[in-house]
Regions:
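An acidic/histidine-cluster motif and surrounding catalytic segment
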Residues: 1-134, 146-183
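Short active-site segment of divalent metal-dependent hydrolases/proteases
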Residues: 139, 143-144
Length: 183
């Protein structure tokens, strides 16, 4: 299992200090597979958001695949891999990493699947900007690729704190505060 990031490894909401060594966006490779026309206009912005999110989370350089799809396709993956009926907003499929540091080259992090219809519907229902909700789900998916989960309250609190910190670095508000306002 990949070693998760730690809160002391995240930069502060104001960004990294000048002494921190930064990976450049070129160190993060994003392969985008888009089978839904509604996603087309988001392909380039998504690539940039994924790279910026990986930097904000201080992920080591590597590659991810982003699969932009719809509810029908997402429901198939959700049933097959999670045993849950119906679509969801984001699914993450981490690539297992062999023990040791003997691997060379960029790390293969895994795949993230995003469902346009569910994300659009959730953003409208929760009174959120589509792009803000989308970037939140990207960060959420990237944390799953690093081994984070939210199966219980303690895990969820840790994951949410990383999401809030990364989103603040990217210029987005705390998405959970917005959820509380619309509850």
């Amino acid at each position: 299992m990949p070693e998760p990031i730690r809160s002391d490894n995240l930069s502060s909401p104001s960004g990294p200090s000048a002494s921190d060594e930064e990976d450049s966006p070129a160190d993060y490779i994003v392969d985008i597979n888009c089978n839904v026309p509604a996603w087309q206009k988001w392909a380039s912005p998504l690539e940039a958001w994924v790279q910026a999110s990986m930097q904000a989370l201080r992920m080591p350089p590597g590659e991810i695949s982003l699969y932009l799809t719809d509810d029908a396709d997402c429901a198939v993956y959700n049933e097959r891999f999670r045993g849950r009926t119906g679509p969801t907003n984001v699914l993450s499929f981490p690539v297992p990493r062999p023990d040791g540091d003997a691997l060379h080259g960029p790390r293969l992090w895994g795949d993230i699947l995003l469902s346009y219809e569910t994300i659009t519907r959730e953003a409208a229902e929760q009174g959120k900007d589509f792009e803000a909700h989308l970037v939140h789900l990207l960060v959420h998916g990237l944390l799953h690729l690093q081994g984070f989960d939210h199966e219980n309250d303690a895990e969820a609190a840790i994951m949410e704190s990383h999401e809030i910190s990364a989103l603040a670095q990217l210029g987005f508000a705390n998405p959970y505060r917005l959820d509380e306002e619309h509850a």
